Amino acid sequence: MGELAVQKNLIQQGYGIYVPVVDSKQVDLIVELNNGSMKRVQIKTVTELKRGTAVEVSLTKYKNTNRIDVVAVYYMPDDIIAYVPYENTHALSLALKTSKNNQTKNRKWFYSYEHFPEFS
């Protein structure tokens, strides 16, 4: 479900997309940017919020592999997608709601990543 939602959204944003025939290298799709470069995307589908405020995904198996450039997070209940440049981390947390203690420092907001990143 998430892969189709991401493909549709990227086409709507005007990108060319390519889907691997075999899912063996941790890449769900490849996006051709406006400058002609290609970016490898891993898609994660999330069905519920952790602690009621944030979408969280584990990325442990991608750390230090140099296999992906962007993580696309599809939050199914709201039918929304975030495109986060992969920074070689073991997990990703994107806030959808304000936390109970109103913490904002070092918090990444889901809606800040609605457009696919253009790399230089």
Give residue spans per PLM region:
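Mixed-charge (Asp/Glu-Lys/Arg
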Residues: 1-25, 30-120
